[in-house]
């Protein structure tokens, strides 16, 4: 893996994406200095903005609604800080959203994991024009008649970047059906700030394809899904340095960048083999797996009394089935430990007679759990675990699958005045009990993005909370 190329690309791509997103925001009157109102000549569903050229910039229809949502998001963030910081936070958020989508699609297309089996960012023949742009209607993406006509006309006019933008958004929305935690529906303000080119050799897409060797993504040629984690760590290089350089208090927003550290492979293997691996070997010493584990340490000689206690423990472990094992990484980052744990669990399942296809589904459902305070790291951990499952089960993305990795959320923005509506339709005893439980949970999760997994979350009656009807439920009935 060429980590120098990966690092150089990630750092450069972050700055490039932020610059591009900021430029697109400026076109619609949104800058770090403030939000401009549309020009007076705006009418109906069309808005005009002064960008210093002879003709004003205009948006209409859905783009107007997307701009309104973008303003709403910035103003909501501004409640916790100042406008400039809120603006920078949202611009950074949009930039990393598209960065995550780009590197995920690159991994999927190189490994032929895309449902259409048609490359989105590159061409198998090496031409500049991506295969999806060449044959857009072979990918089985949903198009309206109007969209098909638009694509035909744009291709005829040789406006490849405009064709690519339409198709890229279509592909992201299609991937939402199989990987919803990473590929969000793009009919929001992030779509308004998307400016990608496939023909510009100074663009992010061109550099992604040409700067990082394709084999680094290809798992059949020595590549690993862990490249996603390395890209994310290097993406945070400059924010991390800036946070440390100010020599002051680290803000909540800066914690993910300054604490993100991609664990070296040998440490991951050592930890997993001597925890998860040892757990299984204690009860199944003849499974023959430890020969595959380079960093597994044999147990030291113990005193007779200790040996007797260990023998009792081994009896319990001997009754374990693979589905009984639960492994959690409470600060999972981009999922490096979980990905290797998936490999070890696969070996355990196979030693117990499972097929790779059944084992992959069971590992997702029963074995692997993860938490992180960083929403973007969570997205990549989710993606990495799902791609590892896809490696063993080519149909895993065809159906609904539960992946137990989560981003810790805090309760700061929840309006507790709304609790008076909670539990409508319940008797007073149940309603008060549910309300007390919910208030306790909200108290615990205050500033959870700062504390993360060190929080001590008490046991709650989840069945009561989940079944408590809300005002929306009552309206439905």
Predicted regions and their residues:
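SAM-dependent methyltransferase catalytic region
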Residues: 247-468, 472, 477
């Amino acid at each position: 893996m060429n980590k120098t190329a990966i690092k150089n690309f990630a750092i450069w791509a972050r700055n490039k994406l932020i610059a591009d997103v900021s430029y697109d925001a400026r076109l619609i009157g949104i800058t770090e200095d403030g939000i401009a109102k549309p020009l007076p000549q705006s009418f109906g569903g069309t808005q005009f903005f002064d960008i210093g050229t002879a003709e004003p910039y205009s948006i209409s229809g859905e783009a107007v609604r997307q701009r309104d949502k973008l303003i709403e998001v910035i103003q909501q963030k501004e409640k916790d800080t100042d406008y400039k910081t809120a603006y920078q936070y949202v611009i950074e958020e949009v930039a990393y959203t598209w960065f995550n989508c780009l590197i995920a699609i690159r991994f999927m297309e190189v490994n032929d994991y895309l449902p259409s089996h048609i490359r989105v960012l590159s061409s198998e023949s090496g031409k500049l024009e991506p295969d999806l742009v060449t044959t857009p209607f072979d990918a089985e993406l949903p198009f309206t008649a109007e969209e098909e006509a638009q694509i035909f006309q744009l291709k005829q006019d040789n406006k490849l970047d405009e064709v690519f933008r339409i198709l890229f958004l279509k592909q992201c929305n299609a991937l939402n059906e199989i990987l919803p935690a990473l590929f969000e529906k793009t009919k929001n303000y992030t779509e308004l700030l998307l400016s990608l080119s496939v023909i510009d050799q100074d663009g992010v897409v061109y550099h992604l394809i040409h700067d990082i060797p394709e084999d680094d993504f290809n798992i059949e040629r020595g590549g690993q899904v862990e490249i996603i984690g390395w890209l994310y760590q290097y993406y945070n290089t400059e924010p991390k340095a800036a946070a440390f350089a100010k020599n002051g208090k680290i803000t909540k927003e800066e914690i993910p960048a300054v604490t993100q550290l991609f664990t070296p492979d040998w440490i991951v293997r050592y930890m997993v083999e001597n925890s998860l691996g040892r757990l299984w070997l204690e009860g199944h010493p003849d499974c023959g797996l430890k020969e595959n584990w380079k960093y597994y340490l044999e147990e030291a000689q113990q005193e007779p009394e200790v040996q007797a206690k260990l023998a009792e423990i081994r009896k319990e472990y001997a009754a374990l089935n693979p589905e009984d094992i639960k492994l959690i990484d409470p600060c999972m980052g981009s999922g490096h430990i979980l990905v290797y744990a998936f490999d070890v669990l696969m070996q355990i399942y196979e030693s117990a007679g499972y097929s790779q296809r059944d084992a992959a589904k069971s590992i997702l459902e029963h074995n692997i759990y993860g938490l992180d305070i960083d929403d973007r790291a969570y997205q990549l951990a989710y993606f990495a675990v799902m791609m590892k499952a896809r490696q063993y089960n080519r149909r895993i993305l065809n159906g609904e699958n539960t992946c137990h990795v989560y981003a810790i959320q805090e309760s700061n923005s929840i309006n507790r005045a709304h609790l008076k509506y909670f539990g409508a339709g319940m008797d007073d005893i149940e309603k008060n009990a549910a309300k007390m439980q919910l208030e306790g949970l909200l108290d615990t999760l205050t500033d959870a993005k700062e504390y993360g997994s060190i929080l001590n979350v008490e046991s709650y009656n989840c069945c009561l909370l989940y079944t408590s009807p809300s005002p929306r439920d009552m309206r439905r009935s």
